[in-house]
From Swiss-Prot:
The keyword Acetylation does not apply. GO terms for biological process: carbohydrate derivative metabolic process; carbohydrate metabolic process. Pfam families: CBS, SIS. This is Uncharacterized protein CPn_0526/CP_0226/CPj0526/CpB0547.
Length: 329
């Protein structure tokens, strides 16, 4: 029996419907209630609970995981488990956010009287403003109602995408309001590529001083080409006798110099064609800061590394290829 074929027309139709749903979400979403929810969380020292059933529950779990990585006191609860003992976690004033597209999810509605008896603050996150869940809640965040991707409008697809967008929006509101630092996030997320990027220091990834190509101000461009070839870094660092950084001469500088001076460039001193005061970074700086410097509006492939801003002694060289091999790009 032949395998079914994937139709290009079907692919384009699905992608078009996804784009249409996301575009509609951004056009129709009103952030006022989401901002109110963020303010409630910021003013609350207790727990913030999230729940949902089915795919909405998966979205709630993901949001909780993001918030926990930002040091928020967030927990997910199953509505069934809540009624089998987990209510003991809920204290007066705690915030409980319930995800339900329809606002009629019976498992969530069953928890409402018990949560109210604990004097919790109920927040409905729904697409149906006149639903029972919305009517019973203290705050209602309305997500624009979007059609699902299947022809029956039943399979949670576009609706959960919009829930995810809302969840990330809420998390980033809290992130910016709290002023979460790179150090804090790194301590919460020490493993994997994210942990490496958040916690790594420049000195962990740089070429050491012994592997840095050096030249001096009076050296000729012709000599620098020999150094280029010997080290293969695509640049030379120009230093004074104490190895203080004076400038950098890259393969890009060489191309520009050839365009300006032609063959005469080989007899010029590096001082005439180098980039003075190049972008650089100290060895104890966060690798994430170095990446920002390298990937700015005019990207560079290398950064000279200094001991500190005051002495400006070159102690290493940071190369984009090293960061790419480490999976940081």
């Amino acid at each position: 029996m032949p395998s079914p074929m994937i139709s290009t027309d079907v692919c384009q139709d699905i992608l078009g419907k996804q784009k249409e749903a996301v575009d509609f979400f951004f056009q129709a979403f009103q952030p006022k209630e989401a901002m109110q929810l963020a303010e409630k969380i910021l003013g609350h020292s207790g727990w913030v609970f999230f729940s949902g059933v089915g795919k909405s529950g998966c979205v709630a779990r993901k949001l909780v995981a993001t918030l926990q990585s930002l040091s928020e006191r967030a927990l997910f609860f199953s509505p069934v488990d809540l009624l089998h003992g987990d209510l003991g976690l809920v204290s007066p004033g705690d915030i409980v956010c319930l995800f339900s597209k329809s606002g009629e999810t019976q498992e969530l509605l069953d928890t409402v009287p018990h949560l109210k008896s604990r004097r919790a603050i109920l927040v409905a996150i729904t697409s149906m403003p006149y639903s029972n869940l919305a009517a019973l809640s203290d705050l209602v965040v309305i997500l624009p109602s979007v059609a699902e991707l299947d022809p029956f409008n039943l399979i949670p697809t576009n609706s959960t995408t919009c829930q995810m967008i809302f969840g990330d929006f809420l998390a980033m509101l809290l992130f910016h309001s709290r002023g979460v630092s790179l150090s804090t996030y790194g301590k919460n997320h020490p493993s994997g590529q994210v942990g490496m990027k958040a916690n790594g220091k420049v000195k962990d990834f740089m070429f050491p001083k012994t592997e840095v190509p050096f030249c001096h101000l009076g050296d000729k461009v012709s000599f620098s080409l020999e150094v280029f070839s010997a080290y293969g870094c695509g640049c030379v660092c120009i230093v004074d006798p104490q190895f203080r950084l004076m400038g950098i001469f890259t393969d890009g500088d060489l191309r520009r110099s050839l365009a300006s001076y032609g063959g005469e460039v080989l007899s010029l001193s590096l001082e005439k064609v180098m980039t003075a005061n190049p972008r650089c970074i100290t060895e104890d700086s966060d690798i994430a800061i170095a990446l920002q410097l390298m990937e700015s509006s005019s990207p560079v492939a290398v950064l000279p590394v200094l001991d500190n801003e005051e002495n400006r002694h070159v102690t290493g060289l940071l190369h984009m290829h090293t960061l790419a091999k480490a999976g940081l790009l």
